[in-house]
Structures are given as structure tokens and as C-alpha cells.
Amino acid sequence: SKMRGFQQGAVPGEEYEEFGRDKEEAIKVAKILEEAGCDLLNADNGTYDAWFWAHPPMYMPLACNLPEASFLKPHVSIPVACAGRMEDPDQAAEALAEGHIDAVGIARQFLCDGLYLDKIRDEKIGDIRPCIACHNGCFGVYRYKGEPGNLPKTPLGRCALNPVTFQEEKYCLKQAEQKKKIAVIGGGIGGMEAARLMALQGHEVDLYEKSDELGGVFIAAAAPSFKEKDRMLLLWYKNEMKKLPITIHFEEDVSPSMLDTLGADEIIVATGATPRVLPIPGIDLPHVIEAIEYLNKDQTTGLNVVVVGGGLTGCEIAYDLALQGKKVTLVEMLDDILKVKDLSAANSNMLRELIRYHAIDVGLEAPLLSVAPDHVVIGTKDGEKIISCDSVVLSVGYTPNALVSADSKQRIHLLGDCEQVGNLKDVIWAAYDLCVGL
């Protein structure tokens, strides 16, 4: 069950006393099921108290349930399947060939790419759109303090990266009757998705990126060690840009005055967002860095770090710092961390347990008041508190960075964070809503 207690899950590598079903009981249950006539056992770990084992997020290693599934196999004569991040073709094939399991259980990867098996069969592994284990589209049931549990705004069983899943008619791509010249400003995920969709419909697409690399802020988002699937997704998008007839203009910083010179029938602006700036004393000191600067490794941190902001990015940065052996304090002005709607409880629960396991200090209802060279001052219910540190990482959100305003007469469309800051699902689904039939 991977339980330390009621509503207490164990994380990989943690030593603990099993509170729920242990291996011995699992053997007994498996034999009972076999005797009752079951044809196959689909084995994984977890309970609702350790939900992240049954629905593993990106913080969980690939094939996380394979050791326990293979343990069960010798005790029954019926086939044993293993589920839980088993989508790596080589890893799955090896587990089958070596007799550890009899079958592989895969669900989310098929939502993300329905041609998953066909691409493996055709030896086109690089063409597979990878599931990043975000749960934002398929299982976004969320909970946090003040919100005991709620359903996401979209139905379950969808995919953040592939809006076509269960919406084939709504998002059916057809060849355009009239070919248009399309200019896409910004080479992040939103810009690349828009360029991809417009090219697939037969339009002539030019993509303008101000830097020398595609990816935008997602390059930083994919940087932590546990985001290997994010990096694979970024590579997938770059490969799609190469495969499709899209002209990419690198180091082209398009200004509003240049839009009329592009000769485009439609202009899609996907210029992203910029970090929010806190107007507090000491915020401009050299040891204070933005989240994106930390993730891009533009600046290193010391050994004693305060992370400001307990949203998803701030918590992931705190975890990433802890993995490096840093002493981390996480401060959040709200009464709970990870107060993010549609963030699956599987993801948030595991991240909370990782923060606990790595002894990351968490201060709630603790707004940042000032920064000094060797400490920060936060607010508390009783007044103020000084926290010693040698580095401060700010993760306090973003503000839209719209190049221009949307203009239907000039056929200018805003897409993604430059219009409204959101997550990966928000920008990809918005791209489909905008581009299909444009």
C-alpha cells in the first residue's frame, strides 16, 4: 500500500513500516483472486493514502511499480501485468523478455499519442508525443486547504498535450480551402503548437523567435532532473518544427511596428509572460534570483536557500534544491502550499511528501517583507521573523507580456501566457481553439 499511516504515503527510497497491505498479504489476496477465476492480475502499488503510486506523477521514477509486480508473479499461475509509468518501450520490452511480468499496462501514453504502438512498430520512437505525467488533462482532481476535493474544469480522461483525445470531431484538422500566410511571434510551446497546427492545415507559416533556441520558458521548466519527459516533449516539438514546412526566424525580436511588414494574413502573438516583481527592500540584491534564472542555471545558489512562493514552480524548485543537498526554506503568503486548481492530487500529494521527506522547512502565511545580504524578513501572525540564508529564489508568478492588443480587423490574435498566464494544458488547448479552422 506504500502507507506510513492514514493519509501518509511513503516516497521512493524511504524506510518505513508498512501501515497498509504488505507483500505477504498481497500474496494471499492474489491467490484468492486466482482461485476465484481471475484471468489476469494488473498489479501496482498505492492506496488513496498513497495515490501517487497508482497514478505516478513526474516525480516518480519510470516503472515505479515493476519490483512489486515482479515479486508477485512467482506466486500465481495466471499472467501478471504491471502499470505505472511503463511507457518506455525498451524498458517494457526488457521486463517482458526477462520474465519479470507477462504484460504491460499503459493508459496515459495512449491518451497523449493514440499511435504510440504504431510508432514503436515502425521504429519511429522519436515521433511519439511523450506523456509527461502531469495529470492536468486526464485526472485533474485537486485538493488543498480550504478545498477538500474538486473536479477539474474539463472532463476526466482528456490529455493536456493532445486536445484531440475524445474530442476528435471538435478538433478535426482539415486542409484549408484558402491557403494563408501565417506569422507566429514567439517560439515557446504555444508558438510552436500554433505553427504546427497551421502548417498541418496547409498554410504557409513563418515562426519568429527572439533567441537562438525554440522552447521559451519551457526550457527552464524542463530543467530539473525529474523533468526528463518534459525535455523529451521539448525535443518532440523541435522535431515537429523540422518535419513540417515551417520557416523559422531565429534572433528576430519582432516589435509592434514590424507587424505590418511581415506580409501575413493572420498574426499569432505568443510572446509569453515575464516574472512578477515584488516591490520590497533588497529585492535587487545580487543573491536574489528569479525562478527562471535558477532553472536556466544563469546563476548558482549557495548552500542555504530561501524559496519565496509555494506554488507549483516554487515547490518544485525547493525539491530540486534539496536533491542537491541544499538547506531549503520555503515561504508562502497563503495558508497552504500548492493551492493550484486542476493540479492533480496525485502530483500535489507526492510533492508534499517529498518536501516532508527532504526536511524542507515551510512557512505559511509568511509574506516576504525585506531581503538583506545574509537573511530575509518574513511576516508572521506574531509580527516578523528573520531567516538566515545566502541565496533567495523568487517564484511569485508571472504577468502577461503581450506585444500588442488583439485586433480582429488587423487579424492579430493573442495566444497563451501573453493573454492569460496558465499551464501547459491551457496554452496547448488555446492553440487548438484558435487555430483549427482559422
Per-range role (PLM):
Residues 16-23, 58-62, 82-85, 106, ...:
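Hydrophobic alpha-helical scaffolding
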Residues 176-209, 214, 249-266, 270-280, ...:
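Rossmann-like dinucleotide/flavin-binding elements
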Residues 7-12, 52-56, 217-223, 280-282, ...:
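Short acidic, glycine/proline-rich loop/turn micro-motifs
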Residues 1-185, 189, 193-200, 205, ...:
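Flavin-dependent oxidoreductase catalytic cores
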